[in-house]
Amino acid sequence: MGQKVHPTGIRLGIVKKHTSTWYAGKAEYADKLNQDLQVRKYIQNALAHASVSRIDIERPANTARVTIHTARPGIVIGKKGEDVEKLRTELTKQMGVPVHINIEEIRKPDLDAALAAQSVAQQLERRVMFRRAMKRTVQNAMRQGAEGVKVQVGGRLGGAEIARSEWYREGRVPLHTLRADIDYATAEASTTYGIIGVKVWIFKGEIIGGIEEVEANQKKKGSK
């Protein structure tokens, strides 16, 4: 059987950027990496209902900058910014340096693989039929302008005795094309029969200019 490489990992430095940006010597590298994992875990748990897709961490000179990409910025910020201030205080305590939090709104949540995977998982937990959940997610993404979408679920589907995996795809998802902008994410649905895994691939088109084009587009978004 053909083994599949992680679609994001193989594209790092080509059309994908790292989610952690900092430099550390040998002595503190492991500590900082572990700290990043703990911070991400804490934010995901604290903002479980805020549709958080991605968390970027930067560490410029004795400070830290955390960017939270979410479809519901109002929930993250809270009344008069109370919730985001609480979060900043807690992260400062965890990281041991002053933390600045940026919140980026996701304009099209249907085109975000992480949010799409979370959506399928939530539907499965509400006992929606898995085929209907997959089809709905794929069609929503295609309607928003995706060039191709694939959703796969695996586990005791429909309460079956034997676990299996099923998938549904529309459009094309070229995993071997390195310049293809493929958003990939996974999620888990906790059902009465056990855990059901969800994988989502969303193909948004090809990036001809490489990582430079990605960075230029991000700067344009930031200046708006």
UniProtKB/Swiss-Prot annotation:
Q: Which GO MF terms are attached to this record?
A: mRNA binding; rRNA binding; structural constituent of ribosome
Q: Which organism is it from?
A: Saccharophagus degradans (strain 2-40 / ATCC 43961 / DSM 17024)
**What is the stated purpose of this protein?**
Binds the lower part of the 30S subunit head. Binds mRNA in the 70S ribosome, positioning it for translation.
Alphabetized InterPro entries for the sequence: KH_dom (IPR004087), KH_dom-like_a/b (IPR015946), KH_dom_type_2 (IPR004044), KH_sf_prok-type (IPR009019), Ribosomal_S3_C_sf (IPR036419), Ribosomal_uS3_bac-typ (IPR005704), Ribosomal_uS3_C (IPR001351), Ribosomal_uS3_CS (IPR018280)
- Gene Ontology biological process terms from the UniProt entry: translation
One Gene Ontology CC term in the entry: cytosolic small ribosomal subunit
Xref: PANTHER family: 30S/40S RIBOSOMAL PROTEIN S3, SMALL RIBOSOMAL SUBUNIT PROTEIN US3C
Encoding gene per record = rpsC
Instruction: Indicate whether RNA-binding appears among the record's keywords.
Output: yes
Q: Report the SUPFAM superfamilies cross-referenced here.
A: Prokaryotic type KH domain (KH-domain type II), Ribosomal protein S3 C-terminal domain
Q: Provide the protein name.
A: Small ribosomal subunit protein uS3
Q: Which residues form the KH type-2 domain?
A: 39-107
Q: How does it assemble?
A: Part of the 30S ribosomal subunit. Forms a tight complex with proteins S10 and S14.
Which Pfam family name is an example for this entry? KH_2
What is the top-level taxon of the source organism? Bacteria
**Which protein family is it in?**
Belongs to the universal ribosomal protein uS3 family.
> What keywords is this UniProt entry annotated with?
Ribonucleoprotein, Ribosomal protein, RNA-binding, rRNA-binding
